Amino acid sequence: MENSQYCQLRKQYIEQQFCRLNHMQRQAVYCINGALLILAGAGSGKTSVLINRISNMVRFGDSYNSDWFPKVDGEYITALESAVKNDEKLDFETEKEISTGAIKPWNILAITFTNKAAAELRQRLSDSLGDTALDVTASTFHSLCMRILRREGEILGYGKAFTVYDTDDQKRVMKEIIKDFGIDEKFVRIKTIMNKISGYKDKLISPAEAEKHANNTLEGIVVKCYGEYQR
C-alpha cells in the first residue's frame, strides 16, 4: 500500500470515530497544534467538542493532519481496512500502532468552573477512553490550584495542612480584625476592605509594598488590615 493510500485510509477511520459531530465541531477536534478558541452558545455542543478533542489527542494525536506512514505489520493495515469497510472500532493497541504524535493523557488538563461540570467531564472522558481517562486531569480551577498548593505550597511558606476560606470565612476574620483595631464599620465597609485587598493580591502586592503607597486614611486602614489578615 502506498503512503498516500494509507494516510487516506487512516483519515477515513478517524472521521468515522467522530462522525456524529458537525463539520465545524470536527475541525476543532482535529486541531491539535496551537491554541484554539471556540465561541458558541449554550447547548451547542462545546463540551462534546472538548471531550472528543481530548479523545482524538490521546488516541490519534496529529494523525488526521499527518502524512506520516508508520512501519507496521500487514495485520494492522488489514485491521484498519476492515474497520473502515465495516464501520468498526479498532482496539487500543492497534490504534496506537497506526497513529502519530499521540499525546500522553497525563499531559492533558481539562479545566472548568463548577464541580458538576468537572464531574461530567470525567464521566464522559471515561465513557470515551475507558481507564485511560483516569490519567487526564479534569477538574475545577479551585481544585487544581488546591492540588498545586498542597504539593508546592512550602515554597510560598504554606504547610500542607492549610485551610481555604470561603467568602463568609473571610468576612468573619476581617470583622474580627477591624474590631481589634477599633475601626468603625460605618466609616469603612468590610466589603470595601476585602475588595481592595483582593486588588493587591491580584497584582501580587504584599502588605509591606502596599504600605509604601498608602496615600490617604482609607488606604492606610486597608493596608493595616491587609497585614493582619495575611497572618
What do the PLM-derived regions correspond to, one by one?
Residues 25, 46, 140:
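Acidic active-site catalytic centers that drive phospho-/nucleotidyl reactions
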Residues 33-53:
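Walker A/P-loop
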Residues 17-34:
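N-terminal pre-P-loop "Q-motif" helix
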Residues 2-11, 15, 33-35, 55-231:
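A basic/glycine-biased coupling hinge at the interface between accessory DNA-binding modules
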Residues 28, 40-42, 110, 117-118:
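Small-residue (primarily alanine) positions within well-ordered alpha-helices
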